[in-house]
Amino acid sequence: MIIRDVELVKVARTPGDYPPPLKGEVAFVGRSNVGKSSLLNALFNRKIAFVSKTPGKTRSINFYLVNSKYYFVDLPGYGYAKVSKKERMLWKRLVEDYFKNRWSLQMVFLLVDGRIPPQDSDLMMVEWMKSLNIPFTIVLTKMDKVKMSERAKKLEEHRKVFSKYGEYTIIPTSSVTGEGISELLDLISTLLKEN
């Protein structure tokens, strides 16, 4: 997939406040500070998604219109300890509404930090998406920070944990080196063309 143009067209802060569905869309979700905005910028090949050093900055669902016909959707990060219980409930309601009501959603890309074992919040997200029958692919981020001698071990560690929930594609990526970006774009292209 060649991304020719990208535009942030909607910032949704309340359930149902979404743009009309298009031909297809994919969404990206992960723990706060997992590198979601950096990965989106790498996919877009331009800096359009805001990257923050402060975890938990994305408190909305951001819809990026790609090539004037698809949405790439940036979901708010989860698992940030300094967020109040009320904010966590608002996040859950917003994301659950999105998952249940976007018929054009082809795939969710679950971003997981490749440097560390999957966290409890990642596994809860897997269970939640499975319970809602949401198709997802696991994307390991920050792989440039994993030593070459440890990569096979880290990949196997993630495969072993996630295999308890079923068979899932795992794509190692780095927004710094570009690793996995073309593979991810190819998968997205296939998904969107099938729609």
Swiss-Prot record:
Q: Which InterPro entries match?
A: G_ENGB_dom, GTP-bd, GTP-bd_ribosome_bio_YsxC, P-loop_NTPase, Small_GTP-bd
So where does Mg(2+) get bound?
37, 58
Keyword terms, alphabetized: Cell cycle, Cell division, GTP-binding, Magnesium, Metal-binding, Nucleotide-binding, Septation
- Give the matching SUPFAM superfamilies: P-loop containing nucleoside triphosphate hydrolases
Q: Which cofactor does it need?
A: Mg(2+)
Q: Where is the EngB-type G domain?
A: 22-194
Under the heading CDD domains, the entry gives:
YihA_EngB
List residues binding GTP.
30-37, 56-60, 74-77, 141-144, 173-175
List the GO molecular function terms.
GTP binding; metal ion binding
Protein family (similarity comment): Belongs to the TRAFAC class TrmE-Era-EngA-EngB-Septin-like GTPase superfamily. EngB GTPase family.
The UniProt function text for this chain reads: Necessary for normal cell division and for the maintenance of normal septation.
The molecule here is called Probable GTP-binding protein EngB
